[in-house]
Amino acid sequence: MAAALKQRFDNALHEKNMVTDLLAKIEAKTGVNRSYIAYAVIAFIAIYLVIGYGASLLCNLIGFVYPAYISIKAIESPAKDDDTKWLTYWVVYGVFSVVEFFADIFLSWFPFYFLAKCAFLVWCMAPTPSNGSIMLYTRIIRPFFLKNEAKIDNVMKDLTDKAAGAADKIKDEAKKATANIMFEEKKHY
């Protein structure tokens, strides 16, 4: 198992893309194998996520930048399988963000929290057929949604109606205020 993972990692380091091109240049200049360079970068990021200033920002960038980039590429591609994969990631990311918001007061006390969060997000975006986001969606989020879909639809409709009513009220108030301002300006001329 470990040998197979190492082989997949090494194969990924030799695929043609921007990161592997940079690794190839560093490997050529230093003579250090690109897998060792990648391990060093991963170790540095892991240590930084534990003790570094701005670990929260780094973790959120890791969980956002690559998935956002790949999501845009998926939208622009003719295939729809990749769209579903990345929509699933964003649903899980959103649910995780809401849960994290409410649990943050407890989670911030754990010294390895940002490292664990980053590992979780990388697991969710892993380029495998059954990565973390797909597993969490199919086992937890989807069953919950299907069980409560009618209730959720009613709540969403109620919120939409209230938001539309509030927007109409604000629009009417803005029209009245504009009319009053124009009336006051005409009185001065």
Curated annotation (Swiss-Prot):
Membrane-crossing residue ranges in chain numbering: 35-51, 58-75, 95-115, 118-138
Membrane side Cytoplasmic: residue ranges: 1-34, 76-94, 139-189
Summary of the knockout phenotype: 60% of embryos die 7 days post-fertilization. Embryos have cardiac developmental defects including a lack of cardiac looping and atrio-ventricular conduction defects with dysynchronous beating rhythms. Increase in RTN4 protein expression levels. Morpholino knockdown causes apparent sarcoplasmic reticulum membrane vacuolization in ventricular tissue along with structural discontinuity between sarcomeres.
Required for dimerization and maintaining endoplasmic reticulum morphology: annotated segments: 114-185
Location(s), subcellular: Endoplasmic reticulum membrane; Sarcoplasmic reticulum membrane
Record key words, sorted: Endoplasmic reticulum, Membrane, Sarcoplasmic reticulum, Transmembrane, Transmembrane helix
One Pfam family named in its UniProt record: TB2_DP1_HVA22
GO biological process assignments: endoplasmic reticulum membrane organization
Main subcellular localisation: endoplasmic reticulum
Segments in the Lumenal topological domain: 52-57, 116-117
Bilayer topology annotation: Multi-pass membrane protein
Cellular component per GO, a single term: sarcoplasmic reticulum membrane
Record's comment describing the protein's domains: The short lumenal loops between transmembrane domains 1 and 2 and between transmembrane domains 3 and 4 may impart a wedge-like configuration, thus deforming membranes.
Function comment: Plays an essential role in heart function and development by regulating the organization and function of the sarcoplasmic reticulum in cardiomyocytes.
Family membership noted in the UniProt record: Belongs to the DP1 family.
Matches recorded under PANTHER family: HVA22-LIKE PROTEINS, RECEPTOR EXPRESSION-ENHANCING PROTEIN 5
Protein's UniProt name: Receptor expression-enhancing protein 5
Source organism (scientific name): Danio rerio
